[in-house]
């Protein structure tokens, strides 16, 4: 769980960093993975593949799991960083979660805005995106909550809490794993 084995500890000296960071994907984590986008409708659940589901339906579970750990910061690691964008995404989340966000894995200042750079970012495996961001932020501890399991570097797999895209955080096994890893991060800071 700790990235301090690979990187020297540097205290969180700016609002863009924190001692403990949770990299949060959205699709397949806080709601069903079958999300669609339309230029006029925006983002919505597939009425065929995710009937009965709604956007952000499992957010209350995340809020509950994070409540004992007010110092845990969130970083958006999702395609939502690009569309609809970081700021627009945060507006859709409850205030309790918005206050925890310190950024996203996609940064216009880091990755640029030209189509080639955007394409390169989109084709980079999620685990590599998260690893690169963790190297920039240098948190003492970090975790990732994601249903995109392909291409994660072996050195980062212990930080990953893997979700199944149709059940995400509604799965009690995932909830238990996240709870235990958050507890471990907290204990690691106290040691």
Regions found by a protein language model. Give the residues of each.
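N-terminal amphipathic/basic-hydrophobic helices that include classical n-h-c signal peptides
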Residues: 1-2, 32
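Short amphipathic alpha-helices and their capping/turn segments at secondary-structure boundaries
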Residues: 2-22, 131-138
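A short, highly charged, low-complexity intrinsically disordered segment
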Residues: 3-13, 63, 184-191
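Aromatic-residue detector
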Residues: 5-7, 23-26, 141-142, 150-152
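Proline-rich intrinsically disordered, low-complexity coils
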Residues: 8-11, 15, 60, 68, ...
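Alpha-helical substrate-recognition element adjacent to the catalytic core
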Residues: 9, 15-112
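C-terminal cap/substrate-recognition subdomain and adjoining C-terminal extension
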Residues: 87-191
């Amino acid at each position: 769980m700790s990235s301090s084995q690979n990187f020297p500890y540097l205290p969180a000296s700016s609002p863009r960093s924190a001692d403990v960071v949770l990299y949060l994907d959205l699709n397949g984590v806080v709601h069903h993975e079958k999300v669609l986008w339309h230029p006029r409708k925006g983002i919505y659940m597939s009425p065929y593949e995710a009937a009965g589901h709604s956007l952000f339906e499992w957010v209350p579970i995340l809020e509950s799991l994070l409540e004992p750990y007010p110092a845990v910061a969130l970083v958006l690691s999702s395609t939502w960083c690009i569309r609809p964008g970081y700021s627009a995404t945060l507006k859709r989340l409850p205030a309790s979660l918005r206050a925890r966000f310190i950024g996203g894995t996609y940064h216009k200042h880091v990755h640029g805005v030209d189509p080639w750079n955007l394409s390169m970012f989109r084709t980079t495996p999620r685990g590599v995106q998260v690893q690169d961001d963790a190297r920039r932020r240098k948190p003492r501890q970090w975790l990732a909550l994601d249903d995109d399991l392909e291409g994660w570097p072996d050195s980062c797999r212990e930080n990953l809490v893997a979700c199944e895209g149709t059940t995400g955080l509604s799965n009690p096994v995932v909830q238990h794993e996240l709870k235990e890893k958050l507890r471990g991060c907290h204990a690691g800071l106290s040691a």
